[in-house]
Amino acid sequence: MAAAQVISNSGHDDMIHDAGLDYYGRRLATCSSDKTIKIFEIEGDTHKLVETLKGHEGPVWCVEWAHPKFGTILASSSYDGKVLIWREQHQSSTAPIGSGAWTKVFDFSLHTASVNMISWAPHETGCLLACASSDGHVSVLEFRDNSWTHQIFHAHGMGVNSISWAPAASPGSLVSSNPGIGQQRRFVTGGSDNLLKIWDYNPETKTYNATQTLEGHSDWVRDVAWSPSILSKSYIASASQDKTVRVWTADASNPGQWTSQVLEFDNVLWRVSWSPSGNILAVSGGDNKVSLWKENLRGQWEKVKDIEE
């Protein structure tokens, strides 16, 4: 198991809100209330600050690396209502990784309030970034034919806190008798209206439409995470201000029928995150602990480990 690396000298002048490793685990991006993003090179047990990105006018909540097939691209979102896309430009194709200069290649500023979370779609569906804002809207940015386009639409009346894409392949498609169905564009949002909504892309109208609403939480939905598993079931985890996590499950044979299991905690919950294989769920909240959960053979979710510093 990989050991945790502590970056004590982050260089930030204020609270750090998010951190993310790139696809290869060689670089770490962090963002802070000091309005900056910092990029570190990670090698073994050492790290080196290589770049500070400035462009936001408020606290930066979220940083997300794109898949490397699209280049070295980082997206950031902020309290200032902006989503910025940064790209590392190399002088030549043989230049080593980390040697390029970072530039801001797109500035999306149509949201009228804080952009709380951003999420890249599975790379099989294209270079797509979904953004969740306190103005109640979701935007989807797409990079295609060397230019950026966008859609923006209303999602939750009291604000959108979180967003997560479904896997590109639908559950059961790997063992389906009709495997050529294609890649789905689908995501889930969590809002301050206590609801989750599932959105599907309609290629004919080229719009995203809310196809399902999941009710159960009694307070704000702080985070949502769609499991990357594409076996026989779909799983969505949601973390709420109501001190519960719900694990929503839909079987491949009846994909529109979602049931949920409630996991109760003693504190407000902030984040949920799935392991790469989609079988272990990590939960973190106001007690500064992380707990790991797994589904047993009876279909019940049980805690397998507590992690605390």
UniProtKB/Swiss-Prot annotation:
<feature type="repeat" description="WD 5">
    <location>
        <begin position="216"/>
        <end position="258"/>
    </location>
</feature>
<feature type="repeat" description="WD 1">
    <location>
        <begin position="11"/>
        <end position="50"/>
    </location>
</feature>
<dbReference type="GO" id="GO:1902953">
    <property type="term" value="P:positive regulation of ER to Golgi vesicle-mediated transport"/>
</dbReference>
<dbReference type="InterPro" id="IPR001680">
    <property type="entry name" value="WD40_rpt"/>
</dbReference>
<keyword id="KW-0677">Repeat</keyword>
<dbReference type="GO" id="GO:0032527">
    <property type="term" value="P:protein exit from endoplasmic reticulum"/>
</dbReference>
<keyword id="KW-0256">Endoplasmic reticulum</keyword>
<comment type="subunit">
    <text>The COPII coat is composed of at least 5 proteins: the SEC23/24 complex, the SEC13/31 complex, and the protein SAR1. Component of the nuclear pore complex (NPC). NPC constitutes the exclusive means of nucleocytoplasmic transport. NPCs allow the passive diffusion of ions and small molecules and the active, nuclear transport receptor-mediated bidirectional transport of macromolecules such as proteins, RNAs, ribonucleoparticles (RNPs), and ribosomal subunits across the nuclear envelope. Due to its 8-fold rotational symmetry, all subunits are present with 8 copies or multiples thereof.</text>
</comment>
<dbReference type="GO" id="GO:0061700">
    <property type="term" value="C:GATOR2 complex"/>
</dbReference>
<dbReference type="GO" id="GO:0090114">
    <property type="term" value="P:COPII-coated vesicle budding"/>
</dbReference>
<keyword id="KW-0906">Nuclear pore complex</keyword>
<dbReference type="InterPro" id="IPR036322">
    <property type="entry name" value="WD40_repeat_dom_sf"/>
</dbReference>
<comment type="function">
    <text>Component of the coat protein complex II (COPII) which promotes the formation of transport vesicles from the endoplasmic reticulum (ER). The coat has two main functions, the physical deformation of the endoplasmic reticulum membrane into vesicles and the selection of cargo molecules. It also functions as a component of the nuclear pore complex (NPC). NPC components, collectively referred to as nucleoporins (NUPs), can play the role of both NPC structural components and of docking or interaction partners for transiently associated nuclear transport factors.</text>
</comment>
<keyword id="KW-0813">Transport</keyword>
<dbReference type="InterPro" id="IPR020472">
    <property type="entry name" value="G-protein_beta_WD-40_rep"/>
</dbReference>
<dbReference type="GO" id="GO:0051028">
    <property type="term" value="P:mRNA transport"/>
</dbReference>
<dbReference type="InterPro" id="IPR037363">
    <property type="entry name" value="Sec13/Seh1_fam"/>
</dbReference>
<protein>
    <recommendedName>
        <fullName>Protein transport protein sec13</fullName>
    </recommendedName>
</protein>
<dbReference type="GO" id="GO:0006606">
    <property type="term" value="P:protein import into nucleus"/>
</dbReference>
<dbReference type="InterPro" id="IPR015943">
    <property type="entry name" value="WD40/YVTN_repeat-like_dom_sf"/>
</dbReference>
<feature type="repeat" description="WD 3">
    <location>
        <begin position="110"/>
        <end position="151"/>
    </location>
</feature>
<keyword id="KW-0509">mRNA transport</keyword>
<keyword id="KW-0539">Nucleus</keyword>
<feature type="repeat" description="WD 6">
    <location>
        <begin position="264"/>
        <end position="303"/>
    </location>
</feature>
<comment type="similarity">
    <text>Belongs to the WD repeat SEC13 family.</text>
</comment>
<dbReference type="GO" id="GO:0030127">
    <property type="term" value="C:COPII vesicle coat"/>
</dbReference>
<dbReference type="GO" id="GO:0032008">
    <property type="term" value="P:positive regulation of TOR signaling"/>
</dbReference>
<dbReference type="GO" id="GO:0051664">
    <property type="term" value="P:nuclear pore localization"/>
</dbReference>
<dbReference type="GO" id="GO:0005198">
    <property type="term" value="F:structural molecule activity"/>
</dbReference>
<keyword id="KW-0653">Protein transport</keyword>
<keyword id="KW-0968">Cytoplasmic vesicle</keyword>
<dbReference type="GO" id="GO:0031080">
    <property type="term" value="C:nuclear pore outer ring"/>
</dbReference>
<dbReference type="GO" id="GO:1904263">
    <property type="term" value="P:positive regulation of TORC1 signaling"/>
</dbReference>
<keyword id="KW-0811">Translocation</keyword>
<feature type="repeat" description="WD 2">
    <location>
        <begin position="55"/>
        <end position="96"/>
    </location>
</feature>
<dbReference type="GO" id="GO:0045893">
    <property type="term" value="P:positive regulation of DNA-templated transcription"/>
</dbReference>
<dbReference type="GO" id="GO:0005789">
    <property type="term" value="C:endoplasmic reticulum membrane"/>
</dbReference>
<dbReference type="GO" id="GO:0036503">
    <property type="term" value="P:ERAD pathway"/>
</dbReference>
<keyword id="KW-0472">Membrane</keyword>
<keyword id="KW-0853">WD repeat</keyword>
<dbReference type="GO" id="GO:0005643">
    <property type="term" value="C:nuclear pore"/>
</dbReference>
<keyword id="KW-0931">ER-Golgi transport</keyword>
